Amino acid sequence: MKRILFILLTCIMCVPLFAQKGQAELAVYGGKLSFTKIDNPYFGSFDPGFGFGFQAKYFLTNRMYWAADLYGGTDDGTTYYEETAIGRTILSAYRQDYSISTGIGFNFVSLKHFNSYIQGLVGIGTVDGYTSNYISETVGFRRDDLKRTSYLVTAGAGLDFAISKHWKIGGAYTFRYLGSVDGSHAIVAKISYVIH
């Protein structure tokens, strides 16, 4: 098994390099977004939503690139039920996430019409929203603002398919860790314009 794995890795590393040093790519992407609580920074949880972003890549070598990313996402409104002393009540929550990040990526498979990459970015992100919480029968409900800014660390992997000399389509998965808030997972489709 180790021998087969070694042969596969050797083949991948020996694949001809088709991305050119100095080449740039501009991409727009969007897709499904879900949130994961890391600690317990707020009451309740958020429903899945959608995210949208722009990314620029500049190839430093034939495989390694520098990337800059602008991103925005939302839960598209969350409602949930809670059993309380006054009966079943509906609580609501809402959030919008924004971030800017930069980092390095690597095309580990690079063919003429296909490439697969991994990337890691760091930056700053902010959350703007609120959560609702039932306190007691006498107090009732409380709306807690969720406005936080924190460092951001992202890791992602994706695939790109060249459909012409200047255009690529593809998909990607990204995990974003927003330090003092939570994490999010995104599966997106994207389209890229290649500048030679």
Segments and roles (model prediction):
Residues 4-13:
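Sec-dependent N-terminal signal peptides
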Residues 1-4, 19-20:
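Positively charged n-region of N-terminal signal peptides that target proteins for export
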Residues 52-58, 100-106, 120-124, 155-161, ...:
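Residues on the lipid-exposed face of transmembrane beta-strands in outer-membrane beta-barrel proteins
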Residues 35-45, 71-98, 126-151:
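Flexible, solvent-exposed loop segments that connect beta-strands
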Residues 62-66, 112-114, 161-169:
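Repeated loop/turn-to-beta-strand initiation elements of outer-membrane beta-barrel proteins
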